[in-house]
């Protein structure tokens, strides 16, 4: 299925940070997808990103990005997701958006309404729950091999500067 001949979907990337860096290699595993263009308001960072990943087009603005892609992957700062997703949908592009998707139910409903009216896809990039290791873990849990589950503790740790903008729920949704 992954190797069937299909028209290539050209993907445009909004945001060129570490999350986007992890995304770029993935379409190479599917013969019908290619990253064709990237955009970052910081053009210097965008040029560097495109050179590193051999992305042919550095978009100067969103209009140029939309002209050169079929779908958009959003990996920009969290507080920009809503505006970028709305802009892409209104430009007729399907959207894959990193988490957190948006900051309110109202924003989510509005974006899904636009996508539905325009018959576009709007997807949250929630990959972990669908990776093979997670599926295997759940099958082990359901099989009883591990025994009765009485408690689950999970954590993600990282050293974050207490003044980091990522802790500001207004702009990043907060990581706490």
What are these regions (language model features)?
Residues 1-53:
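N-terminal Rossmann-like dinucleotide-binding module
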Residues 33-37, 72, 173-174:
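Short active-site oxyanion
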Residues 53-112:
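Beta-loop-alpha module in the N-terminal Rossmann-like domain of NAD(P)-dependent dehydrogenases
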Residues 109-127, 148-152:
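Rossmann-fold dehydrogenase core element
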Residues 128-176:
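Predominantly a Rossmann-like dinucleotide-binding segment in NAD(P)-dependent oxidoreductases
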């Amino acid at each position: 299925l992954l190797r069937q001949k299909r028209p290539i979907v050209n993907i445009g990337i909004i945001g060129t940070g570490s999350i986007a860096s992890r995304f770029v290699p993935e379409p190479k595993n599917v013969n019908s997808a290619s990253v064709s263009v990237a955009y970052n308001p910081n053009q210097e960072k965008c040029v560097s990103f495109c050179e590193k990943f051999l992305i042919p087009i550095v978009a100067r603005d969103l209009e140029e990005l939309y002209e050169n892609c079929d779908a958009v992957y959003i990996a920009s700062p969290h507080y920009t997701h809503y505006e970028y997703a709305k802009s892409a949908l209104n430009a007729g592009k399907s959207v894959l958006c990193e988490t957190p998707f948006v900051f309110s139910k109202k924003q989510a409903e509005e974006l899904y309404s636009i996508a539905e009216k325009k018959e576009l896809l709007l997807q949250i990039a929630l990959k972990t729950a669908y990776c093979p290791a997670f599926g295997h873990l759940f099958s082990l849990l359901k099989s009883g091999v591990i025994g009765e589950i009485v408690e689950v503790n999970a954590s993600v740790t990282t050293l974050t500067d207490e003044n980091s903008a990522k802790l500001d729920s207004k702009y990043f949704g907060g990581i706490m």
